[in-house]
From Swiss-Prot:
<dbReference type="GO" id="GO:0016020">
    <property type="term" value="C:membrane"/>
</dbReference>
<keyword id="KW-0812">Transmembrane</keyword>
<dbReference type="GO" id="GO:0033644">
    <property type="term" value="C:host cell membrane"/>
</dbReference>
<keyword id="KW-1133">Transmembrane helix</keyword>
<feature type="signal peptide">
    <location>
        <begin position="1"/>
        <end position="18"/>
    </location>
</feature>
<feature type="topological domain" description="Cytoplasmic">
    <location>
        <begin position="726"/>
        <end position="807"/>
    </location>
</feature>
<keyword id="KW-0472">Membrane</keyword>
<feature type="glycosylation site" description="N-linked (GlcNAc...) asparagine; by host">
    <location>
        <position position="660"/>
    </location>
</feature>
<feature type="glycosylation site" description="N-linked (GlcNAc...) asparagine; by host">
    <location>
        <position position="277"/>
    </location>
</feature>
<feature type="compositionally biased region" description="Polar residues">
    <location>
        <begin position="133"/>
        <end position="142"/>
    </location>
</feature>
<protein>
    <recommendedName>
        <fullName>Uncharacterized protein ORF54</fullName>
    </recommendedName>
</protein>
<feature type="transmembrane region" description="Helical">
    <location>
        <begin position="705"/>
        <end position="725"/>
    </location>
</feature>
<keyword id="KW-1043">Host membrane</keyword>
<keyword id="KW-0325">Glycoprotein</keyword>
<feature type="region of interest" description="Disordered">
    <location>
        <begin position="133"/>
        <end position="171"/>
    </location>
</feature>
<feature type="topological domain" description="Extracellular">
    <location>
        <begin position="19"/>
        <end position="704"/>
    </location>
</feature>
<keyword id="KW-0732">Signal</keyword>
Length: 807
């Protein structure tokens, strides 16, 4: 067979391909598979990228400042000195504020270059395996007071969705006002609306429903706005908490100022105590100067240094963001230490992995990667800048032998003394080619189309570009069938391979095996009585007979040929070291059908069985097995008849559905058209008012107009109608009588309370004055004895009344 030269690009080689397998043919006769070496493939090297992500927190801070001294707490003579000190503090605060404000403005403009990413664009970007969070923040200070109590923390767990349920009075689906269709008066209303071109109750109800739908939408938007307001409140609370935390960073500076102020107050008290002594006053002034120099000046210096650090940090972020937007990694954002940490991680942990075997870094110097462009991606959220760098890893080339896979059917009784025909087996779904390294640690499969796409033979090697996939590592839990057969792993073959069975044998054939110059011979179903071996150069036995064998390997002497009914082997002239005139010799090598053996051998014994185990000129003992028979039932005609029947039923059903849908659509269109028609053309189309009335009653009751009118003016209907009218008219009278009854009852209760209060007043006067008072209950009159004037409190109004009395 001609050797095809082959080159292929393989990615992610997991093993060293320095040693090349020199086997020309790998025989697995027990499975009917042969691997014929056709070429050597080479992966031309390649580059992969290792990604690493940093999450950089955008620095936030407050501008540091020093508080002024309260000069009112000092002696009046020290006020000029205190004012001078405050002027110095104000000057330092102003200078620090201006420099930091300008730096923050420059940084904000640089951040605007990187637009904020949407949340859905950043899914899992903070959860990657290589994510490293680097916090770059500046010291913070300030004199801001806390605006929230300690327990007034924002509730981060309150994620209850807003109540967007529409109230019942806005729900258009809860309109149950259709009961009014039962009121007889509605008939007259419909009659007049149809005749005099007026909107009917149905039209008004539709308008009400539309208004309810509009109200529901407005209500929903209102609730959504309320929910948005709650969310803004939560954001403000969170911001307030953050500002309180920043405030704590300036407490040290505030305490220093407080100490200075306390020292000055102490000095003032001491100065006042010895005010009478001028020399002592001068000493105290010098002490004040020393305290200002030793306490205030260092605080001002520290404030300026802190402001300068914040300004430097803002400038570093500004330059870093500009470089980032230009496509380069900036050392101001990703420092050399951070870059060195990633490089060390790749060298120690990534490259030793089998997936990255034989891959190397382009450079271990961090400065090399700061010069590379377009090797990163970035995004920005509200408080973070996310930077991902793709570090390239390159790999040198390696070589592996490439084998063409031949699969052929083999008899169940192959290599045994059983000559009965029990069928044939064949391995299914094998690829066209497989490349395996010398240590069988890595392999790759390819198709005939990929093999034919290769071109450009150079020293026995062809280039295939990207026609072949990435090599696969050897794994006992995940293996292809072709590789399992190649390494002759019996357990893996039973797990990953599919064996096909057929009771029809192949045609006789023969193929030379390049590994040992032997021939693989199959007699086929039509077995000859014998095969002829012809050795014309032999003077001892030029012609001999050989008993055929069903799939065996046969070695034939040099200069001899083999003839059969289905094939013929030409004389062998290669690899002959001895004279061609010697005694011809034929050797048969037998193998067993491993698919049949695995059915009768335990798993423990199966590990000791190899597909290439063979006997020379000796058959194996037969295996007791019955011929496999498969029974199938011919129900094709019945299934076809059912299919036709179901197909016809489906067509009928589809036509009926289409017809019903058309009728329904026409009815809906007709009803909608009538509902929208309020013009006097309705009467014109009917021809007369009588026809319009008839059409109205027909639409409402579904009957003839005269039958409906006769039913309305029948004695039964008129009697029922009169009863309903009487009940309606009786309701106001009942309501009036009920109101009168409640009014009289209320007046009677008022009169009883008045008489009771008068009795109590009379008893009090008896106890007070010893007078005899006589009442006449029916007329509320009294006979007065021995008393001229008396005072009574009105129980209703509460006013005092003077009453004259006689004996």
């Amino acid at each position: 067979m001609n050797t095809v030269l082959f080159v292929i690009l393989l990615a992610a080689i997991g093993s060293n391909h320095g040693l090349i397998d020199e086997r020309l043919t790998v025989n697995r006769m027990g499975y009917g598979v042969m691997f014929d070496k056709v070429s050597e493939i080479i992966d031309g090297g390649g580059i992969v990228h290792f990604s690493h992500t940093w999450s950089l927190i955008i620095p936030t801070y407050t501008i540091p400042s020093v508080e002024n001294i309260d000069c009112t707490l000092l002696n009046a003579e020290l006020t000029p000195i205190c004012d001078s000190i405050n002027n110095l503090i104000d000057s330092a605060n102003t200078e620090t504020y201006n420099s930091i404000t300008d730096a923050k403005l420059r940084m904000a403009k640089a951040l605007d270059v990187i637009p904020k990413s949407k949340p859905e664009d950043l899914i899992n970007i903070d959860l990657g395996a290589n994510l490293e969070t680097t916090t770059t923040a500046a010291p913070q200070t300030g004199n801001r007071r806390r605006r929230r109590a300690a327990g007034d923390e924002p509730n981060t767990d309150d994620n209850t969705p807003p109540n967007l349920e529409i109230p019942d009075w806005l729900d258009p689906d809860k309109d149950n006002s259709d009961w009014e269709i039962l009121i007889p008066g509605r008939l007259a209303g419909n009659l007049f609306t149809s005749i005099f071109d007026m909107p009917g109750s149905g039209t008004l109800k539709n308008s009400v429903r539309n208004l309810k739908a509009l109200g529901g939408a407005i209500y929903t938007n209102t609730q959504s706005i309320i929910n948005l307001n709650d969310q803004f409140a939560y954001i403000i609370q969170t911001t307030d908490k953050r500002m309180d935390e920043i405030q704590e960073m300036g407490d040290i500076l505030v305490r220093k100022i407080a100490q200075t102020r306390a020292s000055m107050v102490t000095f003032q008290n001491e100065f006042s105590a010895i005010y009478g002594n001028m020399s002592a006053r001068i000493l105290m002034l010098n002490k004040l100067k020393s305290m200002v120099v030793s306490n205030l000046y260092p605080d001002l210096f520290r404030m300026k240094v802190l402001g300068k650090d914040i300004e430097t940090l803002c400038d570093m972020w500004t330059y870093g963001l500009i470089n980032l937007a230009s496509g380069y990694i900036s050392p101001q954002l990703i420092t050399e230490t951070m870059m060195k940490h990633v490089i060390d991680h790749i060298v120690r942990n990534i490259i030793p992995q089998p997936t990255y075997n034989r891959f190397n870094l382009l450079s271990t110097d961090p400065a090399f990667y700061y010069k590379m462009k377009k090797m990163l991606s970035y995004a920005r959220t509200a408080d973070k800048v996310i930077v991902t760098i793709n570090i390239p890893l390159y790999r040198t080339e390696g070589r592996m032998p490439l084998y063409r896979i031949y699969s052929f059917p083999i008899p169940l009784t192959m290599g045994t003394e059983d000559t009965s025909d029990k069928g044939y087996t064949k391995m299914a779904d094998l690829p066209d080619f497989i490349a395996v390294d010398s240590n069988t640690d890595a392999y790759v499969e390819m198709t005939q189309a990929a093999y034919l796409s290769c071109s450009g033979a150079v020293s026995g090697i062809q280039s295939c570009g990207n026609a072949v996939g990435v090599t696969k590592r050897r794994d006992v839990t995940d293996m292809t069938c072709a590789f399992a057969i190649f390494i002759d792993d019996t357990t893996a073959i039973g797990k990953f391979c599919q064996t096909a069975y057929s009771d029809v044998g192949p045609v006789g054939s023969a193929r030379q095996l390049a590994s040992d110059s032997s021939f693989l011979i199959s007699s086929g179903e039509d077995t000859d009585s014998f095969w002829t071996v012809n050795c014309p150069k032999s003077t001892i036995n030029p012609i001999s007979k050989v008993v055929p064998c069903n799939l065996c390997r046969m070695e034939i002497s040099c200069g001899c040929s083999l003839s059969a009914s289905h094939f013929k082997l030409n004389p062998r002239i290669g690899g002959c070291e001895k004279s061609l005139e010697g005694v011809p010799k034929t050797t048969k090598i037998y193998s067993r059908n491993m698919a049949a053996v695995t059915e009768f051998v335990t798993d423990e014994d199966l590990k000791l069985v190899n597909s290439y185990s063979a006997r020379v000129d000796k058959l194996y003992p037969p295996i007791k097995m019955e011929k496999l028979e498969f029974k199938t039932y011919d129900n094709v005609e019945a299934y076809a008849e059912k299919s036709r029947k179901y197909g016809q039923d489906f067509i009928k059903g589809a036509e009926l559905m289409k017809k019903n849908l058309t009728i329904y659509k026409d009815k809906v269109d007709e009803g909608l058209k009538k509902a929208r028609d309020f013009s006097d053309q309705v009467v014109d189309r009917e021809g007369s008012i009588i026809n319009a009335i008839s059409g109205l009653f027909t639409d409402i009751f579904g009957g003839e107009v005269w039958a409906v009118i006769a039913a309305i003016f029948s004695p039964v209907f008129l009697t029922a109608f009169a009863l309903i009218i009487s009940l309606i008219n009786f309701i106001p009278a009942v309501r009036y009588d009920y109101k009168q009854y409640k009014k009289e009852k209320r007046e009677k209760r008022y009169e009883e309370q008045r008489l009771a209060l008068l009795g109590e007043a009379d008893d009090e006067m008896k106890d007070s004055y010893g007078n005899y008072v006589k009442y006449s209950l029916p007329y509320n009159a009294a006979t007065y004895v021995d008393i001229v004037v008396d005072e009574i409190i009105d129980p209703v109004t509460g006013e005092r009344q003077v009453i004259s009395r006689t004996n």
